[in-house]
Amino acid sequence: MRKLSFDLGTKTCGFAISDILEISANALETIRFVENDFNAVIVKVKEIIKMYQNSIDAFVLGYPLRSNGSKSERTMMVDNFAILLANEFPGINIYLVDEYGSTIKAQRILKDAKLSNKKTKSKKDTVSAVIILNDFLQYGGQKYEL
């Protein structure tokens, strides 16, 4: 089965998906949406599930904890989105992965690839989703329970 990961922001969401053997993470895309209107993300998730013929058995959400491990406003946003996902897709497990530093790693990877600033900005969330999913595939994550 496959895992679908998210790097969720207030106006963008980057997606990555695992291979069927759950060995590697592959970038999908980043979508833009109206600030804090996650219905567009749900619609995109439905498209991805259909595209991958219902082979996705888990969602992996980047969980933006502060460096001291405490929750922030963005963490609460992800908590609310996890509830939305759980209600919309009750048969799919949800895991939370500490995403601390994933954006910095993504920016470093994209800078090393010598992409333009415009390309870097458009790819950052997708690369972050890949990093989050790779972390999950290597180390696991915290299972989300309603």
UniProtKB/Swiss-Prot annotation:
Q: Name one Pfam family in it.
A: RuvX
- Protein origin, superkingdom: Bacteria
Q: What job does this protein perform? A: Could be a nuclease involved in processing of the 5'-end of pre-16S rRNA.
UniProt lists the family membership as follows: Belongs to the YqgF nuclease family.
Query: One biological-process term from Gene Ontology?
Result: rRNA 5'-end processing
- Which keywords does this Swiss-Prot/TrEMBL entry list? Cytoplasm, Hydrolase, Nuclease, Ribosome biogenesis
Q: Which EC numbers characterise this protein's activity in its record?
A: 3.1.-.-
Q: What is this protein called?
A: Putative pre-16S rRNA nuclease
- The set of disulfide-linked cysteines is none
Which GO cellular component terms, listed alphabetically, does the Swiss-Prot or TrEMBL entry include?
cytosol
Task: From the Swiss-Prot or TrEMBL record, state where the protein is found.
Answer: Cytoplasm
- Gene Ontology molecular function, alphabetical: nuclease activity
Matches recorded under InterPro entries: RNaseH-like_sf, YqgF, YqgF/RNaseH-like_dom, YqgF/RNaseH-like_dom_sf
Where are the bilayer-spanning segments? Answer: none
